[in-house]
Amino acid sequence: MIALQIVSDLHLESPIAYDIFEITPKAPYLALLGDIGYLVQHEAEYVEFLKRQLSNFRIVFLVLGNHEPWHSTWDKCLQIARRWERELNENGGKQAGSGELVVLDRDRYEIKGPAGDTVIVLGCTLFSRVPSEAAEAVSFGVNDFYHTAGWDVEQHNEAFERDLAWLNAEVAALEDAGRAVVVLTHYSPTIDERTADPRHRTSVIGSGFATDLSTAACWRSRDVKLWAFGHTHFNCDFTDAGTGKRVVTNQRGYYFSQSEGFIDKVVEI
């Protein structure tokens, strides 16, 4: 069994608070599930925030959210994140007592539990499936398409299908291996009413935030014991009756409109 601390949607970009926001360590492993801040525009501040977390956690998992590439591009954002991963983890540059940074962009990581058991962590942004009838509303109503260069609904949908295909393949490959699987994403994989603010459940731009994956192999698998995500600014923690998996979010939200229920959330797997 391992203990994983879950945090997302800190939005340290406004007001800028990378240097003062503290995460109190309650577990050896930390999952940052996106929208921590502007990764490219605030590169220096963001990486210093990560370094502080690495001094407190054995592993810091980083999933990129839709705000990370704002005022830049997705390619540039991922390029910087991968560079940090290399530089912060290489033996020559790694400080004593510093943890490991693991960027999850269609990536798999294995954690050995204290009893010899293995937990498989799968992570990606996921994005969402925007149907054609909602494309115009989402394009005009979601700020990502204004603030991320070279990004539109078509590319967003392509990224979703790519991430979903990867998740399905990874989970299928692990079927019946006897290992617990944890899935970490930024976007929501479900439209279960427990995962969304009642005020937004009928929103015309809802498909820009969540996708119903109830028929997808990665969701239906009973090997997946935990699916944690962010993006919705609405906190939840429940067990999906159909699969037995725990569904968890722990999102702070914007500083001036913080989400109810943001706590020091730790999940044991």
What are these regions (language model features)?
Residues G113-A115, G206, T211-L226, H233-I269:
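Binuclear metal-dependent phosphoesterase catalytic core
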Residues M1-L62, E68-K76:
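N-terminal active-site segment of His-dependent metallophosphoesterases
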Residues I20-E22, E48-R52, G97, V103-T118, ...:
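Short amphipathic alpha-helices and their capping/turn segments at secondary-structure boundaries
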Residues H11-A17, Y38-Q41, H67-C77, E110-G113, ...:
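Active-site environment of divalent metal-dependent phosphoester hydrolases
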Residues L78-F145:
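Hydrophobic alpha-helical segments and helix pairs
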Residues M1-Q5, R108-G123, E133, A180, ...:
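Beta-strand-turn-beta hairpins that frame and shape the catalytic cleft
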Residues I120-V182, Y187-V204:
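Active-site-proximal loop/helix segment associated with metal-binding centers of metalloenzymes
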Residues Q5-S8, L30-D35, F61-N66, V102-R106, ...:
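Active-site neighborhood of phospho(di)ester-bond hydrolases with catalytic His/Asp-centered motifs
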